[in-house]
UniProtKB/Swiss-Prot annotation:
Record's protein name: Large ribosomal subunit protein uL4
Species assigned in the record: Bacillus mycoides (strain KBAB4)
Chain segments carrying region Disordered: 45-89
InterPro entries assigned to the protein according to its UniProt record, in alphabetical order: Ribosomal_uL4, Ribosomal_uL4-like, Ribosomal_uL4_dom_sf
Function description: One of the primary rRNA binding proteins, this protein initially binds near the 5'-end of the 23S rRNA. It is important during the early stages of 50S assembly. It makes multiple contacts with different domains of the 23S rRNA in the assembled 50S subunit and ribosome.
Keyword set includes Transmembrane helix: no
GO biological process: translation
Quaternary assembly: Part of the 50S ribosomal subunit.
Top-level taxonomic group: Bacteria
Amino acid sequence: MPKVTVYNQTGSQVGEIELAEAIFGIEPNEAVLFEAVMMQRASLRQGTHKVKTRSEVRGGGRKPWRQKGTGRARQGSIRSPQWRGGGTVFGPTPRSYAYKLPKKVRRLAIKSALATKVVENNIVVLEDLVLNAPKTKDMVAVLKGLTVEKKALIVTADANESVELSARNIPGVTVITADGVNVLDVLHHDKLIMTKAAVEKVEEVLA
């Protein structure tokens, strides 16, 4: 079982915690991580692209000139695809790009992402994270005590408005709850900061 040091909010060591081997101690599967990231990024696409077909562009109800005798190429509508201002053939239409991987693959991807942070020594476990009022400077002080200078993902057991509001204005810092842990967020941030309660909740969900 991987062991990780537990810190308090001031950055002092207060003990150790054993992380679940089946979650934090597995060998990260890069192929599964790739598929999970692609799935999440695909679901983020708006898919609102749209072009007009020949039936939707303005004009073109009348045949521009008679079929024979003009010397020009025969035309049936000024809104055919070959005309300037004509409709587009097989152009993009609104669609959803979202798709889902099998549940077992998604769970393996989350485990692999968490295990990656353990392997890289980029996981920090806090005894607890309590802020009496939403203050950015208090959150900055916590991160400074933990010597976190890069992008950080803070995971709490439950929704905590004071923590969320305190971190909202800090560039590169994101706060999520334990049941919202996902591959893209974990890999996108350099440091993973979890409270002990959040670790226990994640282990309970992924066990």
